[in-house]
Amino acid sequence: MNKIGLTLLLVWLAVRAIAADYSYERNVLYRGNAGDEYTSKMCRLDIAYQPDVQNAPVVVWFHGGGLTGGSREIPSGLLTDGMVVVGVEYRLSPHVETMEIVDDAAAAVAWVFDNIGKYGGDTSSIYIAGHSAGGYLVDMVGLDKKQLARYGKDA
C-alpha cells in the first residue's frame, strides 16, 4: 500500500512540475461581436501555453454538463510538455437553443485557428476534445463541415 501512495505522490508532483511551466491567458472573448451581455459573459476561453515552445500541438477542450451546466476548464492531465490547451466556455440551455451552442463551439474553434499562433500553437495540429456534452459539441463541429465553414474554415 505504501508503494501505491508513493507512486501517486510522484505522479502528482510530476504533473505539478509540468503545469508550473505553463502561462495562462484567461477570460478571452472568442466572439468579437458578442451582441448581448449573456453572450459576452459566456463566450470566453482560457489558454494554457509554454511561452518558450513554438509549433506546439493544440487541444481545444469543451466541458461537460448536459448543455445546461458546467464551465470552462483546462484538465491537468492535458498539461503535458509542449502542448497548448484551450478551455472553452459556451452559452447554455435554456438561455439559447442547442444549435446556438454548437455555433459557439464552432466560433471557438475558428478563433483558435486564427489566434493560437500567438501562444506557440501549430494551426496544422489542432485537436478538439470534450467530456459528455463537450464530446457532443466535438462531434457536431468535427463531423459537419458547414459548422466551421460559417467562419471561413475548412477543417
Where are these regions (language model features)?
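Sec-dependent signal peptide recognition
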Residues: 2-10
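Hydrophobic h-region of N-terminal signal peptides that target proteins for export
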Residues: 9-19
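N-terminal cap/lid segment of alpha/beta-hydrolase-fold proteins
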Residues: 19-53
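Short beta-strand element of the alpha/beta-hydrolase
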Residues: 55-64
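Alpha/beta-hydrolase fold active-site loops
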Residues: 57, 83, 125
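Short beta-to-alpha linker loops that shape the active-site pocket of alpha/beta-hydrolase fold enzymes
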Residues: 65, 89-96
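Short amphipathic alpha-helix adjacent to the substrate-entry channel of hydrolases
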Residues: 71-88
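Primarily recognizes the serine-hydrolase "nucleophile elbow" in alpha/beta-hydrolase
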Residues: 110-155
